[in-house]
Amino acid sequence: MANTKREKLFAEFPPVPTEKWEEVIAVDLKGADYERKLVWRTPEGFNVRPYYRAENLEGLKFLASEPGEFPYVRGTRCDNVWRVHQSLTVKCPEAANAEALKLLDSGVDSLGFSLTKGLSAAEVETLLRDIHLPAVEVVFSGEGVADVVEPVLAKIEKEGWQETASVHFVLDPIINRLSLTGAFCSPGGEKCFKMLAGLVRRTAAMKGVRVVTVSGENFSNAGSTIVEELAFTLSAGHEYLVRLMDEGLTVDEAARKIRFSMGVTSNYFMEMAKFRAARMLWANIVKGYNPEKGCSCKLFAHAVTSTWNQTVYDPYINMLRGTTEAMSAAIAGVHSLEVTPFNASFAEPDEFSKRIARNVELLLKHESHFDQVVDPAGGSYYIENLTQSIAAEAWKLFLELEEKGGYVAAFESGYVVERVDASAAAKDKSVAQRRITLLGANQYPNFTEVASDAVTEAAVTRRKKAGVLNPYRGAMAFEAMRLHVDRSGKTPKAFMLTAGHLAMARAR
């Protein structure tokens, strides 16, 4: 009979109260200010302690939930299998189909078709030839997305895939149009929401089809904080929810057709906490409308790695950035993930950069087995507290937007852009002062490197259009100076001016 008596392995190590830890820290600080030395004042609006203990979990109500249980902090599913997503631009349906099939053979199971124009029903057939939609997720985006909706839905019905197809459309007039261009998409204004409501009804029997995508990564790439990205994204999602219900849909019908896309920065633990907080907040938002089905409260999350921190100089570092960002998203339990190719900031991604991007995810899956553990961050004193802090601050900002009439009203008043621009300016200052490090740009540059011919002036020039979100990269100011020098063909000269007291300068 097995001995089931549990041994007390740590009996020789009595628990140490927090007061004792604080006493030791005070001695080590030697009189230095505790708050200034050890407490991190985040741009998100809350402080992070130097350490966390079990007592710091007290009062966190969401800790009792399991993966797949409301409020879905630990995930909307009981597994952590995410889809490996990769996008391609559709110029020729025949060529795009060939490339898509090659991607599927390379481990991708989520295809993104970025359309440059609308496609006919015959062209949609060509594009989707030999692609089995019940097994492969397909996302349509770009200028022609509205025109392909009906041909794609007809294809699903023709094949009898209504119950099994996983297809999403990046129809996002609130962010992709209003927030980026300053105007709603054609036909404009309220008609956009009538059109979306019609598509929700049209796809009611297609459980795996989502017609609205809230493109929150645009906030992150425009320089927002993590809290701002989360609050603004949820606010835009709520705006869709309300507008669709105003068109006569139930909360269940509307919520199940909304997909969220968010960026992932190199802020490793905070990004994990952001997605956990996003699921919790969205679940509570939807629950407030008394849905009939609990599954309507689940947030469907896609993640795409950041472009804000990518650099055109020493670009291979972007591979490392993408890897840590992908890890954050995978651990956080997203539904699908796209790693941005390392050269996307200055060139059309080629076969090599695309292969490296998807192999990052495949390595995390098949070698590191990140898909085998559900919510590995759960129970971490630090990450659970980050989740609570991010959720609390994002909820405050969300309520501010609601008081202003919702996301659209807040954006049209200039509030959203003012917030994001202020955060971007603070980041720019930190980059200039090297408080934010961008390797290869403001820290440890490769002095022998000369920009390749693929790097153009446009790639390092920041667009600044008033009244809208302006995605950019944090390294642009440094890169513009370097590119100017590279193109001039002249070696810059610097005059070293001695200033101050000579005796003090020579003191040893």
Give each language-model segment a name.
Residues 2-267, 271, 289, 298-302, ...:
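Catalytic alpha/beta active-site cores
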Residues 45, 107, 160, 282, ...:
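Conserved, mostly hydrophobic/aromatic
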Residues 200, 204-241, 323-398:
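Mobile "lid/hinge" segments at catalytic clefts and subdomain interfaces of large enzymes
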Residues 2-22, 39-40, 46-72, 335, ...:
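Intrinsic disorder at enzyme termini
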Residues 309, 341-347, 368-382, 473, ...:
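N-terminal glycine-/lysine-enriched basic segments
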Residues 224-230, 265-277, 306-319, 347-357, ...:
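Short glycine/threonine-rich loop-to-helix capping motif typified by GTGT followed
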Residues 234-237, 260-357:
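Glycine-rich anion/phosphate-binding loop at the beta-strand->alpha-helix junction
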Residues 244-252, 286-293, 347, 371-375:
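Inter-helical turn/loop segments and adjacent helix faces that build the functional surface
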